């Protein structure tokens, strides 16, 4: 995707974060069992090929593994205008009780006051505002939900746009510990965990702490500006329990499972607020304050998530890791394989 270009002499600061990702490397379905996914171990300065089931052997007693316990909503809902025309709403985030930010397709004709019905003819939502797009982002539509049951009863789980296959088992796009329905996308690093991994971690003396960050669809978008600082990072709601934060602060090493956990913990460290909205845009030369190790999937080129990973590692290290992944048949993106990284290595 071409970045925004405001002049012939503008330097594309995202060019160093571009790489060729063949379509066949993008995993279209989850692997079974979950913990059989590959795990690229880049701790200690070397690269070795392991599997997720091995992660307990790569950690130490006293490490604290932090996971995001958010649950993906069945957020894609087909509704109908009074005229009978269909509208697909993708519920992104509940901004306040009963008020949701959504994506609507098609959005044309959804003026303030427009009412949309469920498939049984009952009033489901009412449009109360529109947020016009910036760059080429879709129009956001703010709706009041009249019938809260419509999401659970008639919705389906949305998948990232690069996954074209149909998911036969929707539970495979949920972590096994998901319990807080609030997200439009899964915290994908956590998809690799199953009871085998959790049991192995427990036997090793590695405890697990849970935080929540509501994952939005903007997490999948590449950066479209030439200058890194010009990118407007998406904001997401997070929450960390006080006792959980005390455990994190006291841990010998903090192992973040996924970039959503990184954003959560580093936001709390920066702001001192255990609950709020994170607008933290992590890129070099950001100095990490909490996270010591990071387990994460392979991310799309030119994305804020790739910049986060770059800032976590020694300069240029991410490319060596990604080239190894591409050359050794690792599966990329949401349903793909994972890597374990050590800060500064």
What do the predicted segments below correspond to?
Residues 2-345:
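Surface-exposed, charge/polar-rich loops and edge strands
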């Amino acid at each position: 995707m071409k970045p925004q270009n405001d002049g012939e002499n503008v330097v594309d600061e995202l060019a160093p974060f571009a790489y060729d990702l063949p379509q066949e490397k993008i995993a279209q379905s989850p692997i079974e069992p979950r913990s059989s996914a590959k795990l690229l171990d880049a701790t200690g300065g070397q690269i070795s090929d392991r599997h997720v089931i091995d992660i307990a052997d790569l950690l130490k007693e006293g490490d604290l593994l932090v996971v995001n316990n958010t649950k993906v909503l069945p957020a894609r809902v087909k509704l109908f205008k009074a005229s009978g025309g269909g509208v697909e709403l993708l519920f992104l985030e509940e901004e306040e009780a009963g008020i949701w930010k959504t994506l609507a397709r098609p959005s044309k004709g959804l003026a303030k006051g427009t009412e949309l019905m469920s498939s049984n003819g009952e009033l489901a939502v009412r449009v109360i505002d529109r947020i016009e797009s910036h760059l080429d982002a879709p129009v956001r539509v703010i709706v009041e939900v009249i019938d809260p049951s419509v999401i659970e009863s008639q919705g389906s789980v949305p998948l990232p746009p690069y996954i074209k296959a149909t998911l036969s088992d929707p539970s495979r796009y949920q972590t096994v510990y998901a319990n807080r329905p609030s997200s439009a996308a899964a915290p994908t690093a956590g998809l690799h965990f199953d009871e085998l991994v959790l049991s192995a971690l427990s036997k090793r003396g590695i405890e697990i702490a849970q935080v929540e960050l509501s994952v939005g669809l903007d997490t999948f978008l590449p950066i479209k500006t030439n200058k890194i600082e010009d990118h407007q990072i998406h904001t997401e709601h997070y929450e960390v329990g006080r006792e959980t934060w005390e455990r994190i602060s006291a841990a010998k090493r903090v192992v973040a499972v996924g970039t959503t956990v990184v954003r959560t913990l580093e936001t709390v460290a920066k702001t001192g607020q255990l609950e709020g909205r994170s607008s933290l845009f992590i890129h070099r030369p950001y100095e990490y304050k909490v996270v010591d190790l990071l387990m994460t999937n392979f991310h799309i080129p030119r994305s804020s998530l790739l910049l986060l990973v770059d800032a976590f590692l020694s300069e240029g290290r991410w490319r060596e890791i990604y080239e190894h992944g591409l050359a050794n048949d690792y599966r990329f993106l949401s349903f793909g394989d994972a890597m374990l990284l050590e800060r500064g290595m």
